[in-house]
């Protein structure tokens, strides 16, 4: 090799090395430190993940195919994950990555009128949500000093509730009863009655049958309730993890509007299925079982959910969220584990009797076993005046029913109590999806407490009530406005209303039972 060639090679190598050194110095590698775990096993609704030592409790983890799960059991080497999507395609060894965040859901006004799942995915075929604001599904309940007493009524449109078991804004009122006793119907009627009342509604269906959900959606659509309602749905074939997070996600949506100063009504249908899904997940994750195989924190599961419903004071917007949780009892057993838990958490319960339901007394509310612990303070004066003695009279009637089942001949006073009680029961009956206005309810209750229905045959009670409601239009406008506001009824106005009722009910008047007559079979007699 000649010296010139050797020099050229040296210069070339030197240039190359200098260029590489300059490139190395200019290079700024964009390295990202990332933990990657792997799927160890997959079973019904859960996965065991190995690795991810820095993952936090309830952190959202991402699996292949944009499937997500919640880190629920944090062990030394493994993580028990609640799956939130279709896990059937996952295999052992698949990569799992952290997201660094907890489960959240989109919130905002564009959710009104939509049907979504607990992850914010739309189910109604109307396109994706446009809201960019998100809230975590698990949030601490409002502090005591931010709350205000329950003072405003939430009208359900059902006479038996608004008169005898009143509900206030910010209250938690449990709806309980056996299967097929009309629990969901009461909640849906309450939603329908909020039309034009500036109350937003959130309906959360937890693990319900598709046919049942479709029927409810059709009812809401038929009555134009989607104008003020958000519907969240998990169906029976969804992973139990979605059932678990559904009520928390729905509550976050309600909280968003409550913090804007709005009044919200939220329905959980039902928390029995929610508890069962949580039990299934806990057993699969090998958490220690307790009573009825439920885990030890089952009480906290529902208490932290329902404590988020309240009435905020004016300094925090003055909004409210009223909760109507639904649970299913078995064989009328109100003392089972989940029912007693929820009775102790809530501010009262509405108990639906299968015996009343089988006799066609709808809504099948057992007034004796139902109570509203705080709603009475929110009841308007007009309601309180006309319904004050109803509960006592109804209780006396039911006591006499038990005595009358033996076919005993009753004296005149007992017969009068029976007659009046039967008409109370008839007045409290109400067709599904037909909530009544405040004025209509007060007029009927006023006629009832003044014994105007006692001379009317039971078979004509429905027609008589319709006539009484139709007579409202003949009243002076100021009186109608007072009735709609449920203001205190002055004696002069009451005379005018009673005169109208007497004229409206006169065509329906019939003779009453005489002393010594036997009464018709009763609820207790049918049960006997």
Swiss-Prot record:
ATP binds at residues 177-184. The keyword NADP does not apply. It is an enzyme of class 7 (translocase). It comes from the Bacteria. It is a peripheral membrane protein. InterPro entries: Alt_ATP_synth_F1_asu, ATP_synth_asu-like_sf, ATP_synth_asu_C, ATP_synth_asu_C_sf, ATP_synth_F1_a_nt-bd_dom, ATP_synth_F1_asu, ATPase_a/bsu_AS, ATPase_F1/V1/A1_a/bsu_N. CDD domains: ATP-synt_F1_alpha_C (cd18113), ATP-synt_F1_alpha_N (cd18116), F1-ATPase_alpha_CD (cd01132). Pfam families: ATP-synt_ab, ATP-synt_ab_C, ATP-synt_ab_N. GO terms for cellular component: plasma membrane; proton-transporting ATP synthase complex. Gene3D superfamilies: 2.40.30.20, ATP synthase alpha/beta chain, C-terminal domain (1.20.150.20), P-loop containing nucleotide triphosphate hydrolases (3.40.50.300). SUPFAM superfamilies: C-terminal domain of alpha and beta subunits of F1 ATP synthase, N-terminal domain of alpha and beta subunits of F1 ATP synthase, P-loop containing nucleoside triphosphate hydrolases. GO terms for molecular function: ADP binding; ATP binding; proton-transporting ATP synthase activity, rotational mechanism. Keywords: ATP synthesis, ATP-binding, Cell inner membrane, Cell membrane, CF(1), Hydrogen ion transport, Ion transport, Membrane, Nucleotide-binding, Translocase, Transport. The record marks 370 as: Required for activity. Its EC number is 7.1.2.2. It catalyses: ATP + H2O + 4 H(+)(in) = ADP + phosphate + 5 H(+)(out). It is found in: Cell inner membrane. Produces ATP from ADP in the presence of a proton gradient across the membrane. The alpha chain is a regulatory subunit. NCBIfam families: alt_F1F0_F1_al (TIGR03324), atpA (TIGR00962), PRK13343.1 (NF009884). F-type ATPases have 2 components, CF(1) - the catalytic core - and CF(0) - the membrane proton channel. CF(1) has five subunits: alpha(3), beta(3), gamma(1), delta(1), epsilon(1). CF(0) has three main subunits: a(1), b(2) and c(9-12). The alpha and beta chains form an alternating ring which encloses part of the gamma chain. CF(1) is attached to CF(0) by a central stalk formed by the gamma and epsilon chains, while a peripheral stalk is formed by the delta and b chains. Belongs to the ATPase alpha/beta chains family. This is ATP synthase subunit alpha 1.
């Amino acid at each position: 090799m000649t010296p010139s060639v050797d020099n050229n090679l040296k210069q070339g190598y030197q240039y190359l090395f200098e260029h590489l050194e300059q490139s190395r110095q200019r290079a700024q590698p964009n390295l990202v430190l990332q933990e990657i775990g792997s799927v160890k096993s997959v079973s019904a609704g859960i996965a065991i993940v190995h690795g991810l030592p820095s993952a936090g409790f309830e952190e959202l983890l991402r699996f292949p195919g944009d499937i997500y799960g919640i880190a629920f059991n944090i062990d030394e080497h493994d993580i028990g994950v609640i799956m939130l999507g279709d896990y059937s395609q996952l295999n052992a060894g698949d990569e799992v990555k952290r997201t660094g965040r907890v489960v959240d859901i989109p919130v905002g006004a564009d959710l009104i009128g939509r049907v979504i799942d607990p992850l914010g995915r739309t189910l109604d075929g109307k396109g994706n949500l446009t809201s960019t604001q998100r809230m975590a599904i698990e949030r601490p309940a409002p502090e005591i000093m931010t709350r205000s007493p329950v003072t405003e009524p939430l009208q359900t449109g059902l006479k038996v509730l608004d008169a005898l078991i009143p509900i206030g804004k910010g209250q938690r009122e449990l709806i309980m009863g056996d299967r097929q006793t009309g629990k969901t119907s009461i909640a849906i009627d309450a939603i329908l009655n909020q039309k034009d009342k500036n109350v937003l509604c959130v309906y959360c269906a937890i693990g319900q049958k598709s046919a049942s959900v479709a029927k409810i959606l059709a009812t809401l659509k038929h009555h134009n309730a989607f104008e003020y309602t958000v519907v969240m749905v998990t169906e029976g074939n969804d992973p139990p993890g979605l059932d678990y997070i559904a009520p928390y996600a729905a509550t976050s949506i309600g909280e968003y509007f409550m913090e804007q100063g709005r009044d919200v009504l939220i329905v959980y249908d039902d928390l029995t299925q929610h508890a069962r899904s949580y039990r299934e997940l806990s057993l699969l994750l090998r958490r220690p079982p307790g009573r009825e195989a439920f885990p030890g924190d089952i009480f906290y599961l529902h208490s932290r959910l329902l404590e988020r419903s309240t009435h905020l004071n004016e300094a925090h917007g003055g909004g409210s969220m009223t909760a109507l949780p639904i649970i299913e009892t078995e064989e009328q057993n109100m003392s089972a584990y989940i029912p007693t838990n929820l009775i102790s958490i809530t501010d009262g319960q509405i108990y639906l009797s299968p015996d009343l339901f089988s006799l066609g007394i709808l809504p099948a509310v057992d007034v004796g076993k139902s109570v509203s612990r705080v709603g009475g303070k929110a009841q308007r004066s007009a309601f309180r005046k006309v319904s004050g003695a109803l509960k006592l009279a109804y209780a006396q009637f039911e006591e006499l029913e038990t005595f009358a089942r033996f076919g005993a001949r009753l004296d005149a006073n007992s017969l009068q109590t029976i007659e009046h009680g039967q008409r109370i029961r008839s007045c409290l009956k109400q067709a599904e999806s037909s909530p009544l206005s405040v004025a209509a309810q007060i007029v009927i209750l006023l006629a009832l407490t003044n014994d105007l229905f006692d001379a009317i045959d039971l078979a004509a009670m429905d027609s008589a009530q319709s006539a009484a409601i139709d007579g409202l239009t003949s009243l002076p406008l100021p009186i109608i406005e007072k009735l709609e506001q449920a203001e205190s009824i002055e004696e002069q106005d009451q005379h005018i209303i009673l005169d109208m009722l007497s004229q409206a009910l006169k065509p329906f008047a019939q003779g009453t039972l005489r002393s010594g007559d036997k009464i018709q079979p009763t609820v207790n007699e049918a049960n006997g």
